[in-house]
Amino acid sequence: MAEFIRSDILGTTFETTSRYANLQPVGLGTAGVVCSAYDLISEQVVAIKKMMKPFHSTSVAKRTYREVKLLRHLRHDNLINMSDIFISPLEDVYLVTELLGTDLHRLLNGKPLESKFAQYFTYQILRGLKYIHSAGVIHRDLKPGNLLINENCDLKICDFGLARVQEPQMTGYVSTRYYRAPEIMLTWQRYGSKVDLWSVGCILAEMLLGRPLFPGTDHINQFWLITDLLGNPPDEVIDRITTNNTRRVVKSMAKRNPRPLKEILPAAEDAALNLLDNLLVFDPDRRISAEQGLMHPWMAPYHDPTDEPVATEQFDWSFNDADLPLDTWKIMIYSEVLDFFQLTTNAEPSGEQSQNQSQSQSQAFTSSQDLQLASMLNLGEGELLPDFAATIDPNKFGSVDYLMDGQSLDPNSFS
């Protein structure tokens, strides 16, 4: 049976397998706490996210199942990848992912990025979205804090807690207001993957501007800021508003003309502004897709259609509308852990230590009469929201160490 070690991280108890050493607090993520740790098998520093009270209610258990399933099945260079997953004796779910140095929110820190960095980051976001959308998944909560970046400028999308299926009719949701597409604010019953492309436009503008483009104080002020830049929404957009009161208010708004983006981004390249013009479009039917964005002239230095893969199959959303009891969701989560364990143990072993670890976990499983011992597995990957003191100097990309409390994380220093 695998050994679990208890640690206190940000006031909460972490129960991790002996595979992980030197746990250090990173911060609070969505519905969980994140720490860094040294993986004794891979000899890499990783991120471990504890999902708080995953079996507290049916809604929380369903969200936990959705995130675990998504992270298990979505594999792409520009998405955070899960390396391990386990369920502790206290029945908390732990997701283990790669650890990147910072996120875009911290990197910006109130300052614009050089155009070349904004360009490369935008390319990677679009490349990741092309894959996600091809799998029939919408992220729904893209924002700078959900875009992780390392010292080589590699970008990975994380936090799939709000991800949903692309379906003809969808309800509203709570996302970060600054990056929320207008069709969400206008209470459309129908929206699709283009909500993510609106978010990309807001993020690109923020990288060039150094501050949020639409920093609304509430949803009304948010919409006002959007119309102040883009003008009034066209009639075909207004006609699709399903709430009579909202439609009446939007129709009664004073006439506003669109302002040129050059007015607020005078130093931006024309090609970058043109891409923004195609992303920040009221009508999602006229907003470009991720694939079209990759083919935009501003993406030409990086665009390679042979290296922008799509998913090999659609993600299975058959569970999404299921109204199941808590115990059933719990069993389904354990099943995902088991499947992950079987795949990893059938994969090529990485040395004697890894093989011994797999054998130990297998013995823990087969000797158990309770699914609880699925916790002996290593489950992995969830969203990562790094809130630690990592810094990257945009002028010195490629030579930056991960920082924690001002100290470089040197794997050789772990014992």
Curated annotation (Swiss-Prot):
According to its UniProt record, which reaction does this protein catalyse?
A: L-seryl-[protein] + ATP = O-phospho-L-seryl-[protein] + ADP + H(+); L-threonyl-[protein] + ATP = O-phospho-L-threonyl-[protein] + ADP + H(+)
The protein here is known as Mitogen-activated protein kinase mpkC
Cofactor or coenzyme needed: Mg(2+)
Q: Where are the Phosphotyrosine residues found in this chain?
A: 173
How is this protein's activity kept under control? Activated by tyrosine and threonine phosphorylation.
* Assigned protein family: Belongs to the protein kinase superfamily. Ser/Thr protein kinase family. MAP kinase subfamily. HOG1 sub-subfamily.
**Which residues are reported to carry the modification Phosphothreonine?**
171
What does the record give as the function of this protein? Mitogen-activated protein kinase required for growth on media where sorbitol or mannitol is the sole carbon source.
